[in-house]
């Protein structure tokens, strides 16, 4: 890393499972957690802060750079031990996994029904507990998880839910990360056989199960869905290469690709561009407080961002069924400007029925 920096390379470092780099000595046995056997002996180990402080002192302090660390099973309070803003913080941002557990138990290969309440709790706990003390890393996709439209959205309403999911996290406080393919709505890959999967983590799951049952699980949970070649065009190999790609191309590339998205003004890609431009133009997104509404709902995620000068209201429906929305008591939508929505023909009423996977962003200033 130091050699890269000395050559002018590497303004941002991502450090994988950083909380695992210090282990308790003695190789003790553990039988508490069948999924993460032994994790209490190597997660947040005895020398973790010593190692990270050494790396900061000997490498990071010599350069103007940013560090992002991945940390499974970390809570907001534990994350602050690493990222709390100070002259000696060890990491700038931490990638947590709680927002990836809204439809599974700890790992994608132990699925359960999607729960918006679990997702909202993850978002809200990190927004509130890090406020004024640390900076959030915001994401919905990466190389270790299936495609988010197939998980938290709807392939039937791919465009609508893809846009809604963008809104759900792009207006939170923190730095958003967008994974390749997410910005134009790639979905899960569904091959015909389990033998087509290459990820070792996937292939090790339930080898004794019948093929049909394993295939259904892999279709839903495999991180290979995030590792198929990016779909640039509807041409051969999705325009990724004129040679032979290292891995299978998702068969839906004829309909879902960058070229198509660029020429469609209503595409997910162009929606992301609008949302990012708005985010950059609004100080309230960077500096505003966070307040969640509709906490009891399993269909709506509604939150506000507020400074003395601006108030932002974000409304996201996570269902294809109509849901009655009533503006919170301290908001009048008629007095606010509708900045962004994934539907045409929107009227500014304090009470309305949502359309499938509808999203709206309002501003008052």
Model segments located where?
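Alpha-helical packing segments of well-folded alpha/beta enzyme cores
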Residues: 1, 48-55, 122-126, 165, ...
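Single conserved hydrophobic/aromatic residue that forms the stacking wall/gate
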Residues: 2-13
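Short, solvent-exposed beta-strand-terminating loops
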Residues: 11-24, 234-238
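Aromatic- and acidic-residue-enriched carbohydrate-binding clefts of CAZyme catalytic domains
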Residues: 18-46
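Carbohydrate-interacting/catalytic domains
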Residues: 175-178, 184, 189-365
């Amino acid at each position: 890393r130091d050699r890269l920096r000395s050559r002018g390379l590497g303004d941002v470092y991502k450090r994988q499972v950083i909380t695992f780099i210090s282990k308790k000595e003695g190789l003790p046995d553990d039988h508490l957690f069948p999924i993460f056997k032994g994790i209490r002996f190597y997660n947040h180990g005895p020398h973790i802060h010593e190692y990270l402080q050494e790396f900061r002192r000997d490498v990071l302090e010599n350069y103007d750079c940013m560090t992002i660390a991945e940390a499974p099973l970390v809570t907001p309070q534990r994350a602050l031990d690493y990222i709390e803003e100070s002259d000696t913080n060890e990491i700038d941002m931490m990638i947590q996994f709680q927002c990836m557990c809204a439809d599974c138990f700890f790992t994608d290969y132990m699925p359960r029904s999607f729960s918006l309440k679990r997702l909202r709790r993850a978002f809200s706990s990190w927004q509130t507990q890090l406020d004024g003390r640390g900076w959030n890393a915001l994401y919905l996709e990466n190389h270790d998880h299936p495609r988010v439209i197939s998980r938290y959205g709807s392939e039937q309403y791919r465009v609508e839910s893809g846009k809604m999911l963008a809104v759900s996290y792009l207006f939170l406080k923190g730095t958003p990360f967008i994974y390749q393919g997410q910005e134009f709505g790639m979905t899960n890959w569904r091959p015909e056989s389990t033998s087509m999967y290459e990820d070792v983590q996937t292939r090790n799951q339930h080898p004794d199960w019948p093929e049909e049952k394993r295939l259904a699980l892999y279709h839903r949970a495999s991180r290979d869905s995030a590792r198929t070649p990016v779909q640039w065009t509807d041409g051969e190999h999705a325009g990724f290469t004129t040679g032979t790609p290292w891995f299978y191309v998702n068969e839906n590339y004829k309909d879902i690709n960058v070229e198509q998205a660029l020429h469609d003004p209503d595409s997910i890609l162009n929606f992301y561009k609008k949302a990012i431009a708005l985010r950059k133009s609004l100080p309230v997104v960077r500096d505003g407080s966070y307040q969640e509404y509709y906490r009891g709902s399993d269909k709506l995620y509604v939150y506000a961002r507020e400074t003395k000068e601006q108030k932002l209201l974000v409304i996201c429906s996570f269902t294809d069924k109509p849901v009655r929305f009533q503006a919170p008591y301290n908001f009048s939508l008629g007095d606010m400007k509708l900045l962004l929505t994934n539907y045409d023909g929107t009227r500014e009423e304090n009470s309305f029925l949502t359309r499938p996977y509808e999203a709206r962003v309002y501003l008052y200033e």
